[in-house]
């Protein structure tokens, strides 16, 4: 049986340092049967502060403001009670050593997909293929391929306008926007991809 805690219970954290906040967040997640409680607490706080997890762990003794503590408590509750993935809570996910925005309703990039990107890059490393990404979602596949295959271009198709909006933002963040044509459509309705 899951242990449920309310936002009010989490809000009673009266904490001033990152070390204390990470500990309380980790304890809360552990009580709610989150196996990755420690790393999740660290990732949430580092994401909210805007530092890498490593940088956060090096400097755990500075004071936090109430606004950040409130955001942390809300995020920990989303993870522990609602079971939301960290990527959706932070609205970002690293893939192929690149940063991608993600959003509920768009699949979170998975490490296994990096194996596919790796094989495609290895196979086409001396070519300039025209890439077609059907169901692009966050755009992580086509953007990662274009970062490696410097002279390639491609088309990203998705039926979801929300997904395409996120994919376009990701292409701008990762400097590939000028090499991708985005199409909002079902692949079954498209005749010409160029």
Language-model-detected regions and their locations in the chain:
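Conserved AdoMet
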Residues: 46-122
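Aromatic/hydrophobic pocket-lining residues that form π-stacking "cages" and hydrophobic walls in ligand
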Residues: 25, 75, 166-167
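Conserved SAM/SAH cofactor-binding pocket of Class I
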Residues: 112-194
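Non-catalytic accessory regions of SAM-dependent methyltransferases
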Residues: 11-49, 53-56, 61-64
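A general structural signal for well-ordered alpha-helical segments in protein cores
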Residues: 22, 41-42, 72-73, 83-86, ...
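Residues marking helix boundaries in flexible regions
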Residues: 11, 16, 70-71, 77, ...
């Amino acid at each position: 049986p899951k242990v449920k805690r309310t936002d009010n219970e989490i809000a009673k954290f009266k904490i001033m340092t990152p070390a204390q906040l990470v500990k309380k967040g980790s304890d809360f997640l552990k009580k709610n049967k989150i196996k990755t409680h420690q790393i999740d607490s660290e990732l949430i706080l580092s994401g909210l502060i805007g530092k890498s997890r490593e940088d956060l762990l090096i400097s755990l003794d500075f004071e936090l403001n109430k606004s950040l503590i409130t955001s942390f408590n809300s995020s920990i509750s989303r993870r522990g009670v609602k079971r939301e993935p960290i990527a959706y809570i932070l609205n970002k996910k690293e893939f192929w050593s690149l940063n991608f925005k993600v959003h509920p309703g768009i699949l979170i990039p998975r490490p296994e997909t990096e194996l596919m990107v790796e094989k495609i890059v290895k196979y086409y490393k001396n070519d300039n293929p025209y890439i077609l990404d059907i169901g692009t979602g966050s755009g992580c596949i086509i953007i990662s391929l274009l970062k490696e295959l410097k002279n390639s271009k491609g088309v990203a198709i998705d039926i979801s306008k929300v997904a395409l909006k996120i994919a376009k933002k990701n292409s701008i963040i990762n400097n590939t926007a000028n090499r991708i044509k985005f199409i909002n459509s079902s692949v079954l309705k498209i005749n010409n991809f160029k």
